[in-house]
């Protein structure tokens, strides 16, 4: 059965995430990011950050909230039980700090079939409260047996 | 601050070695919000045909990010881009080794080809990181 490509180009409403110090610390601990700039407000400010700064991969925390509705959208039609996370790319710009408010918008960029698998490529663009882009994500999910 | 300018094509970056403990996937689930039971419930994982609960791919990607950021003394501003392919299942209580080689270097920017493996099991392949002096 060919994959349904109707959802290519579909965009979902922005998801908003408020970045807080304790979540940054919890995430830094879970990934083993040891620097004080993720834990101590003054340490972060002393090296030029606006405030305590999130590790780059913290982007998964605020992006996930925007990716959920896209992956679950019946228009996209992903069978979650057979979905694998195939590849991932992030491009970072402005650092994300305690107190930031991040809006993330998801767009379906590609849907195609190869070797009996469905490939679903989504792009997330995250911007901060000043409208500056903080990260662009490219998420490729692979669904077996389409 | 290590000087990215000192790196040249073909240089190896220092290996990052980390062994996630049995409950790491639970802590990462809480930190990231990804509570997919294949990561935190060994019985569920086995019921869907896996050998046991598997590490979150994005946690492994975070180790690749950390391994690369080491060359800039862990400065989170240095990492500009990271792409990875998830090609294997990672498991708790096994050492994960992140290694990389400089592919391009110049003008204060470096591109590093990176892999992450547990023993002979390459869990992340064809990873590429781009770093620049902040």
Residue map of PLM features:
Chain A
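Hot-dog-fold acyl-thioester-processing enzymes
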Residues: 1-85
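HotDog/MaoC-like acyl-thioester-processing domains
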Residues: 1-3, 87, 92-146
């Amino acid at each position: 059965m060919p994959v349904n490509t109707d959802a290519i180009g579909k965009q979902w409403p922005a998801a908003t995430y408020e970045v807080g110090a304790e979540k940054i610390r919890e995430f830094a601990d879970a990934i083993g990011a040891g620097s004080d700039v993720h834990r101590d407000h003054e340490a972060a400010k002393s090296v030029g950050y606006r405030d305590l700064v999130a590790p780059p991969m913290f982007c998964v925390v605020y992006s996930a909230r925007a990716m959920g509705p896209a992956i679950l959208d019946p228009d996209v039609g992903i069978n979650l039980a057979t979905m694998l996370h195939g590849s991932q790319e992030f491009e970072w710009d402005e650092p994300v700090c305690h107190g930031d408010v991040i809006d993330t918008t998801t767009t379906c960029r590609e849907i195609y079939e190869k070797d009996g698998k469905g490939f679903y490529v989504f792009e997330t663009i995250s911007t901060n409260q000043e409208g500056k882009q903080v990260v662009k994500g490219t998420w490729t999910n692979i669904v077996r047996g389409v | 601050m290590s000087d990215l300018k000192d790196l040249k094509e073909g240089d190896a970056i220092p290996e990052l070695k980390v062994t996630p403990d049995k409950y790491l996937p639970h802590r990462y689930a809480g930190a990231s919000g990804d509570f997919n039971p294949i990561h935190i419930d060994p019985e569920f994982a086995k019921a869907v045909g896996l050998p046991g609960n598997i590490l979150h791919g994005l946690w492994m990607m975070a180790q690749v990010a950390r391994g690369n950021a080491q060359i800039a003394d862990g400065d989170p501003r240095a990492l500009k881009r990271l792409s990875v392919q998830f090609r294997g299942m990672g498991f708790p209580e096994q050492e994960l080794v992140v290694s990389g080689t400089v592919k391009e270097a110049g003008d204060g920017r470096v591109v590093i080809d990176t892999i992450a493996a547990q023993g002979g099991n390459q869990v992340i392949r064809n990873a590429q990181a781009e770093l620049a002096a902040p």
